């Protein structure tokens, strides 16, 4: 009996999710602390990947398109060298699509036990994808939640008028999943 309790405790301890420690991450571009285990941000500097790992991040999801000048040349190597797992989804700013969102959902759902950074160049793509994840997968879709998660966009109504492709994407994804 004692062994069973000890074994259960060890299993729980090794699979328990830690929280991201935000104090060391305040200087990351457009960082947004969405929950204890998920943050969104603009592009971290090369040096900040080590800070992210030390703060508890396990997985980095990059939404900057491959070959885009606003990204790092070999971000996968930077992330892996810092001891984290790396995923990339090449999201076209001008033509975001539901397939990319669904791939994002798959990655997020497969890594619910991880502490995650989702980033792009300025935290527009990242916050939009995470908002859609919250709204459709976690069923957290209040007006307050939307405004908080999409805070990097500034005046949301004006921003979505300026970038209508993102309004269309949000409507399509929500219609499909709700």
What is the role of each PLM region?
Residues 123:
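Substrate/cofactor-recognition hotspot
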């Amino acid at each position: 009996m004692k062994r069973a309790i000890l074994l259960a405790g060890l299993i729980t301890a090794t699979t328990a999710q830690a929280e991201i420690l935000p104090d060391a991450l305040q200087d990351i571009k457009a960082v947004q602390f969405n929950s204890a285990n998920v943050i969104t941000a603009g592009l971290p500097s090369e040096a900040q990947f080590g800070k992210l790992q030390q703060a508890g991040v396990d997985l980095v999801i990059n939404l900057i398109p491959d070959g885009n000048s606003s990204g790092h040349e070999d971000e996968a190597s930077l992330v892996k060298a810092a001891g984290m797992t790396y995923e990339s989804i090449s999201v076209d700013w001008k033509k975001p699509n539901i397939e990319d969102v669904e791939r994002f959902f798959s990655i997020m759902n497969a890594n619910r036990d991880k502490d995650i950074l989702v980033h792009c160049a300025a935290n527009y793509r990242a916050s939009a994808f995470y908002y859609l994840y919250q709204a459709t997968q976690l069923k957290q879709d209040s007006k307050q939640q939307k405004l908080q998660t999409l805070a990097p966009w500034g005046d949301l109504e004006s921003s979505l008028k300026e970038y209508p492709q993102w309004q269309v994407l949000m409507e399509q994804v929500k219609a499909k999943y709700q």
